């Protein structure tokens, strides 16, 4: 029996792909189980926050005395915690409290998380005012609390809330349209992670996401301090800080428009090993497909890479996996090596790559000889 390098490579690739698929199936099952049990942990975090608020109120009340504002704050926190716990139970199979901020790709959405944080804070602020209004006995105090909801005092925070919620909706629409238009590649994650808020799908930190989370978080802390100092009105977010948040949101949205891109084939050449003679592309030869965007972000695993297909004429060729320490030598984001099948008819044929995300590249014509 004669040794065939291409057959050996294909056998190794198929065995590796099968093993990787089994591991991936187990990982997906574990991810679903982890997500189903997440609602208990999120509910525990919510009630832990209520306990911390109670301790903070008790410590700061020493010397200053207990006030109606402290009671209203605790009552608002209890109502919020009960609502979040109920919502967590109804969405217990989808991540509990985190269900609304988990995207379609099973990752935490930065835009939804930031918007949700501001929505919860504004809801808590209004509940605090409602609690103080219910406890107020004098008409003058009630009028002062109602005037605390005037737009003139809360224009900054209302503007920020409206823009951030709009950004969350718009980003979902933009990403969906770009995926359908094959201008953005998305692959599903096994489970959401906290790092998703600051990184792209490949796990690399991105400037747009980081600055959006940092600036929005700083503004939220400032608004919380203002609420603690003046609980009789909506936090009056200064316009300078509000504009900073709006600029940060615009930067984040621009980053969403700029990320990704359609994979492209730049050239196709005959692969040449040491000692080979120069010549045309023939059936049975290996060809190198050079370009960009062949491996979608987050698809570096063997189970995802094994889904890549190259169309050579009418023949579909699965890309062989060539492992090396720390990853794979083939395929890579800029280079694919595949054999030309014997079923390809000699003549001019078109080569096209289908990535793991299902996105097709441009067609590139090459000449194949016998």
Outline where the language-model segments fall:
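Ser/Thr/Pro-rich low-complexity tracts
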Residues: 258-370
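Membrane-helix interface motif
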Residues: 52-63, 90-94, 124-142
